[in-house]
């Protein structure tokens, strides 16, 4: 690019206002780029991107500016379906799975251990150019109407002139716009500017995602523009990267896997979203808020467990996956790996654009968390006493794991566990003098 078990899933980015360009608003419009979703299909230099668009303000005040590697032809631009991004989000979302212990009184110890091990292994039960443009050193290279969008491709001699042109076109540019635009002008990149065609948008309930297809040796996402109009704090970006080769990682920032595949207390089921937000923030803090977090890596032909059904071949083609043949991939692998990357970025911790590479690593990974419910029936058998002690030890371990994942205090966890909280260990001095 420019260069069975119950499954509960969450979408880590609750809104997806735009791609990592910036919104520019006319007059006093307050438009903020809070969170983004983007799907990237990449094979060699061939790149297709789908930029999520959940903008909900006045259509007259919408505009999107994105740096692109070259002047795009009209047939390189397409409007996608937001449902496809929703499908990717659901399919790759962090997930909570639950299992229930078997009756210890009806199983021999060897069979019991076999069943517990199998459960933990993860097998589930189921603008025209004018004088202003020329004076500012801006050239309108191309202009198109695509669906509900009017699109212009701009080139600029300097970032100040580009900012001036956009302002004189009636848009209120963020204060740091020229500074943010400058690196792309120096790289001789072009600027894709989309705004709403009110006539074509009549009756449109929601603006559709914009898709672009192009060749570029650079595999990257330009996030610096997205910081120019951030109101405060960091912004979230979810990247769904699809390649023929394997897992995608950042080459200029550390890429880490979110800690997971562990057992956590049962009460988390009531607020899995709140838990995951804390776990994600805690993981970032451990890496000084400078890491790109991997939340999912899997072959798109199957999943285990599945938070949602895998995307169909037709859906993948609509997202730009162009190398799949007509062969069916029912329950087996296909030449396509999905990587879900979550970035929380600001200018202090992410001063550069995101650079990526596709690796040959196809090892599956998912942000998976396990609830192991105890057996709650009659435990009057001889094995029942031993099993009860095992459950107490397991709950203590689950509470410790939760504290490590989230940074929550042991006391607050014990309070939320209620009667399931393991008893506090005796003071150390109890065993000294007998």
Predicted regions and their residues:
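Sec-dependent signal peptide recognition
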Residues: 1-7
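A mature extracytoplasmic/lumenal domain signature
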Residues: 53-55, 68, 155-158, 198, ...
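Surface-exposed, glycine/proline- and aromatic-rich loop segments on solvent-exposed faces
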Residues: 41-104, 162-183, 188
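A cross-kingdom signal targeting lumenal/periplasmic-facing segments of multi-pass membrane
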Residues: 78-146
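Short, compositionally biased low-complexity segments enriched in polar/charged residues
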Residues: 27-42, 126-136
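Short hydrophobic-aromatic micro-motifs
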Residues: 48-50, 148-155
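Accessory, solvent-exposed terminal regions and/or long lumenal/extracellular loops of proteins
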Residues: 21-31, 173-401, 405, 409-415, ...
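Sec/Tat signal peptide C-region and signal peptidase I cleavage site
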Residues: 13-18
